[in-house]
Amino acid sequence: MKKNRERFCNREREFVYKFKVGSQCLELRVPLRFPVQENASHLHGRLMLLHSLPCFIEKDLKEALTQFIEEESLSDYDRDAEASLEAVKSGEVDLHQLASTWAKAYAETTLEHARPEEPSWDEDFADVYHDLIHSPASETLLNLEHNYFVSISELIGERDVELKKLRERQGIEMEKVMQELGKSLTDQDVNSLAAQHFESQQDLENKWSNELKQSTAIQKQEYQEWVIKLHQDLKNPNNSSLSEEIKVQPSQFRESVEAIGRIYEEQRKLEESFTIHLGAQLKTMHNLRLLRADMLDFCKHKRNHRSGVKLHRLQTALSLYSTSLCGLVLLVDNRINSYSGIKRDFATVCQECTDFHFPRIEEQLEVVQQVVLYARTQRRSKLKESLDSGNQNGGNDDKTKNAERNYLNVLPGEFYITRHSNLSEIHVAFHLCVDDHVKSGNITARDPAIMGLRNILKVCCTHDITTISIPLLLVHDMSEEMTIPWCLRRAELVFKCVKGFMMEMASWDGGISRTVQFLVPQSISEEMFYQLSNMLPQIFRVSSTLTLTSKH
């Protein structure tokens, strides 16, 4: 059969088209190799252009060419089919082998015959956890998570104390050395001692880092195994000992004096809430909130001295595997790590509690680095190919060298995502890359940071994130150049752009109601906060309240 098919493939036929121009009879002959791989419309256009054919034959030529290709192709298919049947009849082809080949191909390409994929451990655990957190056992789960949280907090407290003692001891040693500088000691002695101090700090930090990593890994394994066992036991109605295990009271939470010293106190927040309508014909309703708060307040676990420990995680846990996820936007630099700034603070908060569902923040960042490296490599190779095929100049060479030098960095406006189950009110963190340009007062709606917000909102629509927290001024901390006019201009720009993006969302997700939280730094004044609050109803169409009065 294969020989017969090769016989009919790559056969050349001549297409003949006759037409009249005035009193002249002309003939167009074009050799075509079958099967024709090119689109008939494209081939027709090339013939018109190549032979300078008159426009009045364009339609007729296209019909004739299309008909010729279809007829000749069908003839080839018929001859191929007849030759295949003859091969089967003559015994040249094994009928049973042919039938088994067809059956295998059909089974591999048909869904009803496809083998079901075996669920992974993560999928099984997610289903089990979702069932338990929506059952009376939810309090038991949160109690266990809290006990693990206290254990890690104690460990971190011990680490901080030991590091503090080491730094104090090293500070005293350095002071003594500085007093002897120029007398019995030289600059080389000071540098040598500083290097020893740095190495000692690194060794101690690595020791505690490994211990924390090991402890969280053990906790995660114990927790997941316990959740699976609890789910299996709950299915057994004869297990009477389980009812006592589930009835764990909040008073049984373990407290520690050292951990209390590391409590995150809730600072006084300013907050305004609005209900808005967007769209003229297809109206969608959304909730907007303006808050004066630290972005990391939505991540930190909070405690209440009077009533013991109070974790604000019940709603977060209930919606972990739902279609109502919560996210926030962190403004970061172009390096994918957790070594400085808000990235370090965020990583510290993530380490406060073991993540029982997703990889550690460090592991997720390593994956992001590999993805960015692959993407940059692909872009660089394509850019190099385009430069090699076109005209090269100095500017393009500089651009290529710059891309090669920063291939592990993200660009302004790009963002990467991390997933979390161990934060207070957040499931997803968008790490949006911005540069110092956002601190200037002349950014526009086409600025990379603004376009990054648009792409983030689009991801929210496509991945069931219904609550998103955004830094309104595109900064996490205030500085001297951020005057009142600067704040008003920046807030107006972000409000208007987000409004436009939310109107786009109606076409992306069908108009699902969402909550957008605009956060301003805590150092902003109350007067400035209320000016921003008064600006919001002027940009968004706020729902008016209806007052009902009874008639006597």
UniProtKB/Swiss-Prot annotation:
InterPro entries: Fy-3 (IPR019311). It comes from the Eukaryota. It is found in: Cytoplasm; Early endosome. Component of the FERRY complex (Five-subunit Endosomal Rab5 and RNA/ribosome intermediary). The FERRY complex directly interacts with mRNAs and RAB5A, and functions as a RAB5A effector involved in the localization and the distribution of specific mRNAs most likely by mediating their endosomal transport. The complex recruits mRNAs and ribosomes to early endosomes through direct mRNA-interaction. Plays a role in mast cell degranulation. The keyword Cytoplasm applies. Keywords: Cytoplasm, Endosome. The lineage of its organism: Eukaryota, Metazoa, Chordata, Craniata, Vertebrata. It comes from Pongo abelii. Its main location: cytoplasm. This is FERRY endosomal RAB5 effector complex subunit 3. Component of the FERRY complex composed of five subunits, TBCK, PPP1R21, FERRY3, CRYZL1 and GATD1 with a ratio of 1:2:1:2:4, respectively. GO terms for biological process: regulation of mast cell degranulation. Residues 383-403 are annotated as: Disordered. One of its GO terms (cellular component) is cytoplasm. The gene is FERRY3. Pfam families: Fy-3 (PF10154).
